[in-house]
Amino acid sequence: MYLPKEKEIIQIKSYKHNGKLHRTWKKTVVLKSTENIIIGGNDHTLVVEADGRKWVTREPSICYFHSDYWFNVISMIREDGIYHYCNLGTPFAVDEQALKYIDYDLDIKVFPDGRFHLLDEGEYEQHRRQMKYPDSIDRILRHNVDVLSHWILDKKGPFSPDYIDIWYEKYKEYR
């Protein structure tokens, strides 16, 4: 399996269950790269939507991807605190072109005070019917919502108090 090196610039591409490209983040700096975990950082990076619309992220963020879990976490560093946006999707795959995953619509937004909300359940149900997500995928995703909720409550992984300090410092050093 190809693994990007630390300091390497990669693209992140999300797809939908039907194989169509959903969104591309053009530049993310690799901060950590192992077979199980890739952590990246970006700031004001260009994002291209499947329909061609383009926008630029507003703040620095640290991105966490794991090969064993069906979610990834984007931690956005804002003036009023850290916001985490958690995408429910497949574990990552990576090649020379990009880090890739399938986005399954469900998201969890975590606020600086620790409150969190599950988002986009209607979109998930609509796409589940349209793209015929198998029941096995639904079970995996529901289980990973539970795992992710426990990580948030237990301040594990990207939700630990030191996570942002450590990885944002490394990002500032590498960029």
From Swiss-Prot:
InterPro entries: DUF402, FomD-like_sf, Ntdp-like, SA1684
Protein family membership: Belongs to the Ntdp family.
UniProt-recorded name of the protein: Nucleoside triphosphate/diphosphate phosphatase
Endpoints of the signal sequence: none
Oxidoreductase listed as a keyword: no
Keywords linked to the UniProt accession: Hydrolase, Magnesium, Metal-binding
Reaction(s) the record says it catalyses: a ribonucleoside 5'-triphosphate + H2O = a ribonucleoside 5'-diphosphate + phosphate + H(+); a ribonucleoside 5'-diphosphate + H2O = a ribonucleoside 5'-phosphate + phosphate + H(+)
SUPFAM superfamilies: FomD-like
Phylogenetic placement of the source organism: Bacteria, Bacillati, Bacillota, Bacilli, Bacillales
Keyword Metal-binding attributed: yes
Role played: Has nucleoside phosphatase activity towards nucleoside triphosphates and nucleoside diphosphates.
UniProt organism field: Listeria monocytogenes serovar 1/2a (strain ATCC BAA-679 / EGD-e)
